[in-house]
Design a protein with these regions (language model features):
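N-terminal loops that bind phosphate or other acidic moieties
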Residues: 2-117
Length: 117
């Protein structure tokens, strides 16, 4: 399962770095940030490329920082043409829980359900 963290600024990069400090290096865990000099369209294009570069059959789970924020909206706009799971309001404990679920071979859907409980 590929996990893609998306945020305002460098929050997602810091989140990924912190998670890897806690649980070790992670494959298929990437971070994207929306910076003031970028447009939402540019971020959306990068995220779509990340989706398209994912091997067929591999699940994708997006983690975003803020409900209805621009990164959230960019991810949601991609749901029209792509199938993936999405959790918003992400923080370090939640991201660690996602990684632990991945270690336990849980599906993206199982991880999302567990977090919502």
């Amino acid at each position: 399962m590929k996990v893609i963290a998306v945020s305002h600024g460098s929050y997602s990069k810091g989140l990924v770095d912190s998670v890897q400090m806690l649980v070790g290096e992670q494959e298929s865990l990437v971070a994207y940030g929306l910076f003031p000099e970028q447009t939402v369209a540019t971020l959306t294009e990068k995220l779509e490329k990340e989706i398209n570069d994912t091997p067929e059959g591999e699940e994708i789970l997006f983690l975003t920082d803020l409900f209805h924020g621009s990164p959230f909206n960019a991810v949601v706009s991609l749901m029209r043409d792509h199938e993936f799971h999405h959790i918003t309001g992400i923080n370090i404990p939640l991201a660690v829980e996602v990684m632990m679920g991945r270690y336990a071979d849980k599906s993206a859907e199982e991880i999302c359900r567990g977090i919502m409980e």
